[in-house]
Amino acid sequence: MVNYHGRKEVSNILTSEEYEELKGQNFLKLSVSKTEYFDLFLLGVGLYAPLEGFMDEDDYYSTLEQFTLSSGFLWSIPIVLRVSEEEARLYDGREKVLLTAANGELLGLLESPRAFKLNKILEVEKVFKTSSPEHPGVQKILGEDEWAVAGKIKIYPPAFREIDLNLSLFPQKTREIFKSRNYKTVVGFQTRNPIHRAHEYLQKIALEIFDGLFVNPLVGETKGDDIPADVRLKCYEALLNNYYPKDRFVFATLPAPMRYAGPREAVHHAIIRQNYGCTHFIVGRDHAGVGNFYGPFEAQEIFDTFPENALEIKIVKFDNAFYCSKCGQMATKKTCPHGPEHHLSLSGTKVREMLREGKPLPEEFTRPEVAEVLRRYYQSL
């Protein structure tokens, strides 16, 4: 089976006894932001391996400037715990700091915190390739604190009330499932939208080649106009249970914040899927993009710039699929010679408009069971 990234399994989990004991201790507390809430969980369960906690100054600047951790392992996105200058002074050098959710619930702890100053302009230019406040990621970072505290973390997963532990499987569990099913190859597929026929077509091409498909939708922090996670989950359930062989796919949600960092985020997503145990990962057109900030294939091309041994997981590059009325089937530009006038293409805006008006979506665009879930949601608004 594929190794964890950095060849290091990470599991920084508190037992219920340790958690209860921690509750009674009188350490300083630090409330984490929404993004940090999900990052903290993923650090603790080992999906950000080899990281064992929030980045220190060396890892932060190395990630931005070298595209690696200070240890030399490939890394693309800074995972930091942002604080004000006043908080940085307060927490720096302490033995432990208790990390809490916005409502005050204890999530875990930060050990031996060390404070350092961030460079937000450098960060947005490196991570997002722009400093335009029109980019949601840039806008977010520039509005945040300029300091960070680094340190190893430990978490108590049941305290993360926003995360469904029955659906957000730990990497040890997914690896166990892949092994029990004798999958030698597993291809990961990420989405933050309902799966329509185009995605289904690409996934089924992948299933003709690989032993297993890991469907891993992102359900952490997304943009305000994205379809809510619970509605998307009903769509995935309707599709997978009716149209996929049950022994060929594994479904789990990924409670990660969406950064809209295009190419760098595609690398981040590939590392997470390697930690889950995937041997391959599908990167489609404009993966993790937003607006027109990235070229359609930049997120695929970035993988060609790394040394061959930088990642064990292999990238599967797909173009957009569509229904061609002339071919009478799903296709991509690689297999269809006909012009766009023969391709069924519905924008997200058009789909939402049709659903709100109760109009049926074409079966060539989406399965009727998925359309029904979406129709009920939009008519309830």
Curated annotation (Swiss-Prot):
Matching entries from InterPro entries are given as:
ATP-Sase_PUA-like_dom (IPR025980), PUA-like_sf (IPR015947), Rossmann-like_a/b/a_fold (IPR014729), SO4_adenylyltransferase_pro (IPR020792), Sulfurylase_cat_dom (IPR024951), Sulphate_adenylyltransferase (IPR002650)
CDD domains in alphabetical order: ATPS
What EC designation does it have? 2.7.7.4
Lineage: superkingdom: Bacteria
GO MF terms on file?
A: ATP binding; sulfate adenylyltransferase (ATP) activity
Q: Does the keyword Nucleotide-binding apply?
A: yes
Q: In which pathway does it act?
A: Sulfur metabolism; hydrogen sulfide biosynthesis; sulfite from sulfate: step 1/3
Pfam families, per the entry: ATP-sulfurylase (PF01747), PUA_2 (PF14306)
* Catalytic activity from the UniProt record: sulfate + ATP + H(+) = adenosine 5'-phosphosulfate + diphosphate
Name the UniProt key words of this record, in alphabetical order.
ATP-binding, Nucleotide-binding, Nucleotidyltransferase, Transferase
Q: Which GO terms describe its biological process?
A: hydrogen sulfide biosynthetic process; sulfate assimilation
**Stored HAMAP family:** Sulf_adenylyltr (MF_00066)
Q: Which family does it belong to?
A: Belongs to the sulfate adenylyltransferase family.
Q: Which NCBIfam families match?
A: PRK04149.1 (NF003166), sopT (TIGR00339)
What this protein is called in its record is: Sulfate adenylyltransferase
